[in-house]
Amino acid sequence: MSSEIAVIILAAGKGKRMSSDIPKVLHKLKGTTLIERVIKTSRKLHCKKIITVIGHQKELVKQSLIEYKDVTFAIQNEQKGTAHAVKMCFENLENFDGNVLILSGDVPLISSKTLEKLIKAKENTGAKASVLTADIDDPIGYGRIIRNSSGSLNQIKEHKDCNQEQLLINEINAGIYVIESESLLEYIPKIGNQNAQGEYYLPDLINLLVLDNFSVELHKTEQIIEISGVNSQEQLRELELYSK
């Protein structure tokens, strides 16, 4: 892989459904916190930067990662969405030119192998970005991948913004992206929050690229467990069955 890689890990959320006093990303899976698992996977990609976005109980998260000297932090004090979280990383990305891989701190089983394929999907096609997708039986809550007649991406639409026809789509956005750094810095400020949640969505960056006729590559994975997030204690217990 020719271009340098910077990794952004989104870890600022409260995780209300965990019903716990500690931040969601500090819950442990087989003895290792969720955020540490994502950092260790990122390291396997030989990335130049690992930027972790923190917010809720930020000092606790920061302290837990004190031994990870290669990790820098960006602060998202207000939870205004994933695009807003990435915007908080602009200072950390100063003078960086390459691919930015965006991960979630609560998706602990993603593998470096899958991420390498996603990066190659962008690099090999000359696309501005690549998006990880998957076909799942129960797509409730996930953003949908809407393709055009030729099979290319038309748009990504959040579940709450989908019409009845779009809700029947089973191909979902896994929330993992590779984006050219120049495009990231240019398009993040263009994102609005005219949606059901009133938030700044990262998928809208992808949609803006498509609207401007730039190529976005879709990489579909069959490793469904790898893209499973932790939003509750029940989901955490479920992932215990699959983790090493």
Residue ranges and their predicted role:
Residues 1-20, 50:
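N-terminal nucleotide-binding beta1-loop-alpha1 segment
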Residues 69, 110-196, 205, 214, ...:
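Conserved core of the sugar-phosphate nucleotidyltransferase
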Residues 7-9, 51-52, 101-102, 129-132, ...:
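Structural beta-sheet core signal
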Residues 2-3, 32-103, 109-113:
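Conserved N-terminal catalytic core of the sugar/cofactor nucleotidyltransferase
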Residues 22-28, 191-194:
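Short glycine-enriched, charge-decorated loop/helix-capping segments at active-site entrances
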Residues 28, 109, 178, 229-230:
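Short aromatic/basic micro-patch
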Residues 9, 35, 50, 89, ...:
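Residue-level signal for inorganic ion chemistry
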Residues 1-4, 197-244:
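Left-handed beta-helix
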